[in-house]
Design a protein with these regions (language model features):
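Helix-to-loop junctions at the C-terminal end of transmembrane segments
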Residues: 1-14, 101, 211-223, 307
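Short amphipathic helix-loop junctions that connect adjacent transmembrane helices
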Residues: 178-197
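C-terminal ends and interior cores of transmembrane alpha-helices
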Residues: 24-38, 233-245
Length: 343
């Protein structure tokens, strides 16, 4: 769906309508869960599918609009700032629900959760209002980046193909935090209590946000070399988290995980901006999202299966895949530098 949405955005240049449609679907469906009955799991599933569809529709257009604005300050800074704000919202949302649950003690658990979903309509309305205001002030975001009067199809040039292979290897080896949380809760209760797990996740998200901004700034100065650094730094996290025997190694592993997550949310998108022509960039983001998502899904399934077989093997595969991405980053970077030199 992201490729279709991206190609549609490129062909029509209707970035705002596509972006707004996706946001509306995504933001309306979550508060609508408050209207689902106690046994209405089918309706809840339908709403969640619609929410995911909305996210898929909006993402290529959103990233493309950010990339246009990035031409003024730098792609790394722009996507790093986007991730910082995204993580701010990711922390603020659960905090809001925690406060609501803390003070709303009457009613059943189901009624309290329904009220929480309904309360999420407030930030949803604020978000849509801000989008409308931004749309009114900047109706043609493509003008931030002057170039390409006509649509130029995205070509599968060698540097982009090598880059996609690299990010697929990285995504395949990058474990989801849910597996980290499950492992800690099952086997590391003597190291860290279950009550601390949410705080550990919050710390990881904080590292994610800071790393995204930092690596974004570094990307604008040094280019894709920073991707190599981030891969080297984050690759050992699986050994520390799954094979470590102390709280110190666990915390260090989670910090490394946060660095890897922050890097992928800023540098990886910034590189797509620099590799794709303006007129077909949304298609490029769609291909990037599809490749990354499929690789992460397959990697999560494979590493989850290996978790029950051998932790050392699982950690080794995770680290190896992330490190195997480095040669592809370097090759892609060299080709990019050559193309700039001959441009």
């Amino acid at each position: 769906m992201r490729i279709v949405s991206g190609r549609l955005a490129d062909r029509t240049r209707k970035y705002w309508p596509i972006l707004m449609a996706g946001y509306c679907l995504e933001l309306i469906t979550i508060p609508a869960l408050a209207l689902v009955g106690e046994n209405g799991w089918i309706a809840a599933c339908v709403l969640l599918v619609i929410q995911k569809a909305g996210k898929a529709i909006k993402k290529p257009a959103t990233d493309t609009v950010v990339s246009f604005a990035a031409s003024q300050e730098g792609a790394g800074k722009a996507f790093g700032l986007q991730e910082l704000l995204d993580q701010f919202g990711a922390v603020l949302g659960p905090l809001l629900l925690y406060v609501i649950m803390l003070f709303k003690t009457e009613g059943s658990t189901f009624e309290r959760y329904s009220f929480c979903f309904l309360a999420l309509a407030v930030p949803a309305i604020i978000t849509l209002t801000l989008l409308i205001v931004t749309r009114c002030n900047f109706p043609n975001p493509e003008l931030f980046e002057p170039d390409a009067k006509e649509y130029v199809p995205l070509k599968a040039d060698k540097r982009f193909v090598l880059y996609i292979i690299g990010i697929c290897l990285f995504a395949f080896g990058f474990l989801d935090y849910s597996l980290v949380a499950m492992h800690v809760s099952r086997t590391a209760s003597d190291i860290i209590s279950a009550e601390v797990l949410p705080l550990l996740y919050s710390a990881a998200m904080l590292v994610d946000a800071v790393a995204a901004l930092l690596f974004g700034y570094l990307y604008d100065r040094w280019g894709m070399k920073v991707l190599v650094v981030s891969a080297i730094v984050s690759a050992p996290f699986s050994f520390l988290v799954f094979l470590g025997k102390s709280s110190l190694t666990l915390i260090a592993g989670v910090v490394m995980w946060g660095i890897g997550m922050g890097a992928q949310e800023s540098i990886l998108k910034a590189a797509v901006t620099d590799m794709t022509p303006k007129s077909s960039r949304a298609t490029g983001f769609g291909i990037f999202s599809l490749a990354f998502g499929v690789a992460w899904f397959l990697g999560s399934w494979t590493l989850g299966a290996l978790y029950d077989v051998n932790l050392t093997l699982m950690a080794s595969v995770s680290a190896a895949c992330q490190l195997l991405a480095i040669p592809f980053y370097i090759l892609s970077s060299n080709l990019m530098n050559k193309s700039r030199g001959t441009a």
